Amino acid sequence: MITKSRKIALLGLSCAIGIALGLAGAVLADKPAALDADLPWADARTLAEVLERVKHDYVNPVDDHQLLQAAIRGMVSSLDPYSAYLDGDEYDEVKISSSGQYSGVGIEVSMEDEEVVVVAPLEGSPAAQAGIRSGDIIATIDGVPVNTTSLADTIGRMRGKEGTTVKIGVLREGSAEPLQFTLKRSRVELRSVKAELLEPGMGYVRISQFSETTGDDLDAALKDLRKRNGAALKGLVLDLRNNPGGVLEAAVSVSDAFLESGVIVTAKGRTPESKFEMDATPGDALNGAPIVVLVNGGSASAAEIVAGALKDNHRAKLMGRTTFGKGSVQTVIPLPGDRAVKLTTSLYYTPSGISINHRGIAPDIELPRDSAPPGAPVSADAPLLQRDEEVRRAVQELKVPTVGGSGSVSAAARFK
């Protein structure tokens, strides 16, 4: 039997939750009718009753605020691996990350089936230098199991003051025992575009992730390559391996640089602002010179937008391994009290109308995970063509004529 005092406590919690739901209804009042459904008052009462039971009967004292925060987290995290409720510290962390630099180990992660999975280590980061790979599962941080209910907690534990160390234990397919990495945190600066001339006429552009400046940085890199070559490029290797994604607009800008026309990406969601189609504008930075795009399991999100746009528009061949398969768009929505909710608001589709979510994009030319030829190891100071077998194969593909042996074939003809 519930006593009078417990009834009062239950009433108080019910009122608090009722006020919150009422405010939510007010917020939704100017939204489309599809979003203005009846609020689940019966479920709200059940929530209040459970909270009251926990407060009264749980073995240890509990904090109302922490209980409600946990309830909110559980609600949002149950949606998909990429949606999350962000408290003040976590929201600040998101803003720091988007600024282009932070102190940490440089790993892009996602939550999948209650496991923290490495999407990709950022190029040049402590994690990349130590050998952490896309697909690794982070099991422990400093010997303590990761919190599989809060991705933000895991990210926060990996970040810290520059120069400090953190021990990360990972599970890797093919390894019987967990692998241990001791990493020294450093300043992670997101320089997203690097370029070099592989040989006369053949350019190489590496995009490590997509930031707000990536489009402009690509334009500058291509101009520099043309200047160093002394003429227009005859082919380009676009390296998107282990690129975890980033800013959607940057991916559209990169795709548009190589397309004369056609759809780049289409997004579909429930609200008008979450539905859009991005189309290419006239002008091809390479004037039709062929492109090979290198991809692997660490190529995700915005990187997959570029790969899909160039492949489906018959502008490039993909070489490597199937991409990660993150075909969704997240929007960070600020809340009162310097908090926010990160929600998946759209699914995006390649120009052919295919959603790559959870399936990825298969390459035109598949390469094994270890593409290095047998023989003595190559010095890190050696030219890229000597130390990266996949880049070498991409250049070979760029040189292969497909019509009558003339070699003077347009990209559209070669890649259909």
How would you label these PLM feature ranges?
Residues 340, 352-416:
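Conserved functional hotspot residues or short segments at active or partner-binding sites
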Residues 2-83, 116, 414-416:
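Terminal targeting/pro-maturation regions of precursor/exported proteins
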Residues 31-43, 47, 52-64, 117-120, ...:
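Cleft-lining beta-strand/loop regions that shape enzyme active-site pockets
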Residues 337-346:
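Short acidic, Pro/Gly- and aromatic-enriched capping/linker segments at domain boundaries
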Residues 135-137, 354:
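Structural motif
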Residues 58-119, 163-167, 171-182, 189-192, ...:
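Extended, small/polar residue-biased N-terminal targeting/export presequences
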